């Protein structure tokens, strides 16, 4: 059985650091390559978590970890940042594994902070000569601009597909062909996703490892005093670099593993066992609390799942709960969270299956399931009651939360409520949230981008007739729609769950059962479900109504 994995955030100085934690037993640290994040090490995490408490940190500027403040980053800077992270979590001396850029960071960490490291397993230490770096990477860091025409998706797909064909990917010569088969489409999709997440911040750290670290790597290897295992698969482009290492000290060795990734994982486990370290892993140190700025955390809920939560403001103030629209997540509410947090403690969870929150384990969850999950979240946070604002598909959850847990909801406001007629409901269920399957040519990225973009033009988005035009102002900026696309793509297998749940929910009856008098936000382009504003106003003729924004109904 694979041990359960948890996601966490940790405050390290002024930065938020995201990490994965899995397993029980002595602690061990894993460091990913670039331009990836800790999820790339999922197979290693699953393997090692049967024996260790594994901590896999997103390095600065990758995944969900904030970047270092300087533009000219060195591997030493990254190693020092990791040492600060280990200190912040009170990590005892333990074994460390790193791959490629992660191997460079692990090596530098062990040299600069040996008291923190019982030993290192280094998978592919980059030791390029300056001449090789100048030749191989002249065009390696080519920018892929985000455009309002969506051209970035074909460009990124081709770039990471090419990475599976040539090294470097930008030099398409016979002698640069990789000695293995083209990677599966799922692998290309994963790399494209990781790249886009880090696209604005990855380059300084990646350049530090590929362009400038080669000579320093050999110096660090010569200075290393802790036990070490150097390795790489035979097909790794960095395999030849092991021959460049200086003479090794006692307790340090080079190990060949052929082309077997299973052999690599077994070698890591054997190395960790030999290195030893502390017997007990540290507890997670960060919690929900006061924040002047927007902060994020993962909260454990039922069935081993987690809710990704954005929060801001001071605990003890009146609490406001924001429930987002779909498709998407609370990412769309960050500006509203910050605005409301000046006078309230604001919670904005990604609803289950959306954004970075775990999906329900059961098939076809209901709106009641979502409402109960949010009530459970509030209990776990120690929040007694909230002013709730539900937007679009999230409004259905807000209504059901007020009905099923009336003591929790002191105020309720709604912006766009799904109120289709029966035939319209079936029509929407058939077309509104199509599956997002990975395509070999990467076209699923553009198709998803186009779906979201079209939702700003037509209601519903797939009815592209003149009569269906929304005639509402919308944000068509390249950055906005691209961020939205990444958000939905991150939960592509479950993004539709909330939509189907709302389509199976009778909001008319639910509104009639309300014991708390809602306020309505009518008009504007906040949600496509504003198409039902006339029906909503007719159902609730005597309630307070405002235009956007909703602050007047909540505070």
Sequence positions of predicted segments:
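N-terminal cap/lid segment of alpha/beta-hydrolase-fold proteins
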Residues: 1-16, 281-306
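Active-site loop/oxyanion-hole signature of alpha/beta-hydrolase fold enzymes
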Residues: 55-101, 348-393, 555
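Hydrolases whose catalytic domains are alpha/beta-hydrolase-1, hotdog thioesterase
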Residues: 105-109, 397-401
């Amino acid at each position: 059985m694979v041990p359960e994995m948890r996601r966490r955030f940790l405050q390290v100085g002024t930065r938020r650091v995201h990490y994965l934690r899995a397993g029980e037993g002595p602690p061990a640290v894993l460091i990913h390559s670039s331009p990836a994040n800790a999820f790339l090490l999922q197979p290693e995490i699953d393997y090692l978590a049967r024996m260790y408490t594994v901590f896999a940190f997103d390095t600065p500027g990758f995944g969900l970890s904030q970047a270092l403040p300087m533009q000219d980053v060195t591997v030493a800077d990254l190693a020092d940042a990791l040492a600060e992270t280990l200190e912040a979590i009170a990590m005892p001396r333990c074994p460390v594994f790193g791959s490629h850029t992660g191997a460079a960071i692990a090596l530098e960490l062990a040299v600069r902070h040996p008291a923190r490291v019982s030993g290192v397993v280094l998978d592919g230490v980059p030791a390029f000569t300056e001449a090789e770096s100048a030749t191989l990477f002249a065009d390696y860091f080519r920018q892929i601009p985000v455009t309002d025409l969506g051209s970035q998706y074909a460009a990124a797909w081709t770039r990471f597909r090419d990475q599976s064909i040539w090294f470097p990917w930008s030099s398409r010569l016979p002698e640069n062909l990789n000695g293995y088969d083209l990677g599966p489409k799922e692998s290309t999709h994963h790399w494209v996703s990781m790249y886009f997440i880090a696209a604005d911040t990855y380059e300084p750290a990646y350049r530090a490892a590929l362009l400038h670290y080669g000579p320093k790597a050999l110096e660090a290897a010569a200075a290393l005093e802790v036990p070490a295992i150097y390795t790489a698969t035979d097909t790794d482009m960095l395999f030849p670099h092991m021959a460049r290492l200086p003479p090794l000290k006692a307790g340090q060795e080079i190990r060949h593993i052929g082309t077997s990734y299973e052999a690599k994982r077994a070698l890591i486990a054997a190395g960790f066992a030999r290195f030893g370290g502390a017997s007990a892993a540290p507890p997670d140190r960060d919690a929900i609390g006061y924040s002047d700025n927007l902060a994020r955390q993962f909260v454990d809920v039922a069935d081993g799942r987690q809710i990704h939560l954005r929060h801001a403001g001071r605990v003890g103030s009146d609490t406001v709960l924001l429930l987002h629209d779909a498709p998407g997540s609370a990412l769309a509410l960050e500006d509203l969270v910050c605005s409301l947090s000046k006078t309230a403690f604001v919670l904005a969870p990604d609803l289950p299956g959306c954004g970075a929150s775990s999906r329900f384990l059961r098939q076809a969850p209901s709106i009641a399931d979502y409402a109960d999950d949010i009530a459970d979240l509030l209990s776990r946070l120690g929040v007694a009651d909230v002013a709730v604002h539900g937007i679009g598909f999230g409004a259905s959850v807000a209504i059901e939360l007020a009905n099923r847990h009336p003591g929790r909801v002191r105020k309720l406001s709604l912006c766009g409520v799904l109120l289709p007629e029966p035939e319209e409901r079936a029509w929407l269920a058939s077309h509104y949230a199509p599956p997002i399957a990975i395509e070999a040519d990467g076209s699923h990225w553009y198709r998803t981008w186009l779906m979201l973009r079209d939702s700003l033009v037509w209601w519903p988005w797939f009815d592209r007739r003149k009569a269906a035009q929304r005639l509402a102002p919308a944000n068509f900026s390249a950055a906005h729609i691209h961020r939205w696309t990444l958000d939905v793509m991150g939960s592509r297998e479950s993004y539709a769950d909330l939509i189907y749940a709302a389509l199976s929910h009778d909001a008319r009856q639910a509104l009639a059962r309300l014991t708390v008098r809602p306020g309505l936000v009518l008009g504007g382009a906040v949600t496509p479900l504003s198409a039902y504003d006339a029906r909503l106003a007719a159902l609730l003729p005597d309630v307070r109504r405002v235009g956007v924004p909703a602050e007047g109904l909540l505070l």
